Amino acid sequence: MSTTTLTRREQRAKAQHFIDTLEGTAFPNSKRIYVTGSQHDIRVPMREIQLSPTLIGGSKDNPQFEENEAVPVYDTSGPYGDPEVAINVQQGLAKLRQPWIDARNDSEELDDRSSAYTRERLADDGLDDLRFTGLLTPKRAKAGHRVTQLHYARQGIVTPEMEFIAIRENMGRERIRSEVLRHQHPGMNFGARLPENITPEFVRDEVAAGRAIIPANINHPESEPMIIGRNFLVKVNANIGNSAVTSSIEEEVEKLVWSTRWGADTVMDLSTGRYIHETREWILRNSPVPIGTVPIYQALEKVNGIAEDLTWEAFRDTLLEQAEQGVDYFTIHAGVLLRYVPMTAKRLTGIVSRGGSIMAKWCLSHHKENFLFEHFREICEICAAYDVSLSLGDGLRPGSIQDANDEAQFSELHTLGELTKIAWEYDVQVMIEGPGHVPMHMIQRNMTEELESCHEAPFYTLGPLTTDIAPGYDHFTSGIGAAMIGWFGCAMLCYVTPKEHLGLPNKEDVKQGLITYKIAAHAADLAKGHPGAQIRDNAMSKARFEFRWEDQFNLALDPFTARAYHDETLPQESGKVAHFCSMCGPKFCSMKISQEVRDYAAAQTIEVGMADMSESFRAKGGEIYLKREEA
């Protein structure tokens, strides 16, 4: 852990330098590949890890090698992972999905922004230096049209986004020929449908059934299509965002790029500080992954942080503002009902969700029902016009082990199920947010209740944390719960960083949280038996047994840390080919001994075979040529 503390000015300067010098970068010994779909502009990015050959025999002067296949892996880094792409943050990313959106002919450009707040910001010349220069002209659905992926799925139409996703979810495993790499243990999937091969039609069917969502606002054409659902790979979300006391636009863009490099499938901008609108524009125009927000945070800023002063009109304006910028999914705390708030009085830690506490305070102050619940159909109408997915927030999630699985939590969950059905009436895609703090033996009930109450809509959880005693290590405490609930069927895991409960995460914290959660998600995929999930593990194990150190580093989720730890004790180049590491040394390496045992066993088999043949030869009279028996 770094002990160097930078001043605010130094942090901003460092982030600005990162942005100014940003270029497409591949991981060590990896290359970017593209798998093409049925039309030329469906080009699905993957990272292919190149491996060295295995020494199988020969002599020192004439060694014999056997090639090892490259291993393709899912890649969330977008253009930032392609060394051939010129990166310019000032201009933003290429608009990958724009031709697909235009071809559907179901949306139109707006003459002006629908949000009064957006119009005010654009008219403020004092913001010119902060503003992203290449602003898009926003689109919305034409009158009488719905533009959502759910709408098209229900019509039986496979969109280019769905085909892109099918290719992506298969992870290029059809390229693998080695039986060693293809071997996979059967999983326990708790009722999930995991086809051997994911087709565009399967993607369409899952979206149509509401079991999966494709967050893809028509005003975020830069994003690469991805899917969230329990019958697909488990996804990971990273949270970024400024606060009233720290961070800047430069730092948030840096964290966005950093998040996608380390595997974030989506990113939530949870900014609560200054210049929220401008920060979000920079993030969206440079994001290859879907962006989510919690609109109530910005709505609260618009009323000077006074929850009692919130109004539906201010919130509605915020939804329009963010939808026309391109936000792909909104967290809406519409399930925090007035009658549920007293249920939290007996809790140890009360209401820990920021959005939940804001709405609870508003309800009690006015003694009225939650205006998000009351206006939910209007929220759905807005989302349907831009294809903004809804992430129904768990405002009453437990904030401590003692409060897990209580009446308030599950009452809200049942209401979220009712709201899900309403959203589906408008062809709006929905996922459900979940806890929180839950001990291991109580986690599975959360998944079971969600599937039953919310009609199998995708579940999206924060951890859950499995113990409360480890501040500073809550990426571990929650990673345990995340792996478990991912196995049980959770579709997306919201990462937790080492700074959880302590402070705003920095760049290194983001990386640590993501690595922890990529481990949890992958462990869940293995346990479910997701087709192809074990390929990378098999490749790593083979490289480990064959002492191919460079391949071990490069197959790791974090090649740089793996190499650094190895080189702390064996930094010489000879250490990269040694048949041992510093843990056991040359004489006690179990894998080296195992290889020797295998070689010895093979030699013994040959000797036994020769002895058997010798005995057979003598038993037949010792003749070189045996007489042919007469018929």
Curated annotation (Swiss-Prot):
Q: Does the keyword Metal-binding apply?
A: yes
Q: Where does substrate bind?
A: 239, 268, 297, 333, 353-355, 394-397, 433, 460
The catalysed reaction is: 5-amino-1-(5-phospho-beta-D-ribosyl)imidazole + S-adenosyl-L-methionine = 4-amino-2-methyl-5-(phosphooxymethyl)pyrimidine + CO + 5'-deoxyadenosine + formate + L-methionine + 3 H(+)
Give the co-factor note: Binds 1 [4Fe-4S] cluster per subunit. The cluster is coordinated with 3 cysteines and an exchangeable S-adenosyl-L-methionine.
The prosthetic group or cofactor this protein requires is: [4Fe-4S] cluster
Sites binding [4Fe-4S] cluster sit at 581, 584, 589
GO terms (molecular function) for this protein are: 4 iron, 4 sulfur cluster binding; carbon-carbon lyase activity; zinc ion binding
Q: Which GO terms describe its cellular component?
A: cytosol
Is Protein biosynthesis among the key words of this record? no
Enzyme class, broadest EC rank? lyase
- E.C. number: 4.1.99.17
| HAMAP family with a match to the protein in the record | ThiC
Biological role? Catalyzes the synthesis of the hydroxymethylpyrimidine phosphate (HMP-P) moiety of thiamine from aminoimidazole ribotide (AIR) in a radical S-adenosyl-L-methionine (SAM)-dependent reaction.
Tell me how this protein assembles.
Answer: Homodimer.
What is this protein's record name?
Answer: Phosphomethylpyrimidine synthase
